[in-house]
Amino acid sequence: MQRRAFLMRAGAGVAATAVGRPAIAQTGAPVRWRLATSWPKSLDTLYGSVEAMCQRVGQLTDRKFQIQSFAGGEIVPPLQVWDATQNGTVECGHTLTSFNIGKNPAVAFDSGLAFGLNTRQQQAWMNYGGGLELIRALFKKDGILPIPCGNVGVQMGGFYRKEINSVDDLKGLKFRIGGLGGMILAKLGVVPLQIPTADIYPSLERGAIDAAEWIGPYDDEKLGLHKVAKYYYYPGWWEGSAQVTLLVNLQHWEALPESYRAALEAACAETTVLMMAKYDTRNPEALRRLVAAGVQLRQFPRPVLDACYKAAFETYDELAGRSADFKLIYESWQKFLADSNLWFRVAENTLDNYRFAMSAQPR
């Protein structure tokens, strides 16, 4: 309802201001946009989903609205997609917004918080729990409109050169990780380093870092991380849901006709569903291949997870005390998390835990 209401309000705004708007917004004339991403083309699920989204927009608008996608580094560096969208270098960009917590830590709610909402919960909060409205109000300050456009689901905990048997093993660990996850781990002695995707493998290979996380088995295999580190840990508690987002320059968004806006939002919603389905299909197969290649699967010890959980919520409380933006969104997020977890504990997790246990037994 809230998404539909947003589109209705946007359409009303277009009609009310048609006289003073560019001709494009009045006539539905052809539009050509450039889209910068943070992804290399080798990541065919992530970058490929962006390409498919662009094609879908064209289909929905009889080819009048064309968006051309570019891999990370082709127009701007992978970690500068936000800036390029904000300053109008490109009309839009596709990225993980937690790369930009240095601008405002509250942007992390868009991509997902450690020990927070899972993929389905994130989608529910964004679309029907008030999350999208709060995040759009935040991003508007930078002249950006965010549109959820994909989700990679829960992540793995990364590849490590050494085993992690205790909290002490985290101290001094040079770890490729971005976002609030890095801030949380720094409390436990980790040295977090935000490195672009294409630089992860060479950094791990030459020993510039001791460990690296990216997404999950399919993409991690694509990057070849298993060739330079053998211990593969789980779960990736820092992102139980990693939503990726289309950032749109607000001026360019406001210049679009209502039908083009609707097409773009519809294509992004479709991309979210299909991206999750692709990862859920491809990750199991990739995990089997990695294990067959000699990768050593390891679960983070419970004391390590407990320490990280404590540090995570201490970090959130500290940020809420310093940032009015963070506090406002955190209050909404916390309530939704508590309510949603109650339902998941009663139904989803009870059934899942039982069937997982039974599937591990001989029939």
Name each model feature, range by range:
Residues 2-122, 130-363:
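N-terminal secretory/targeting leader peptides
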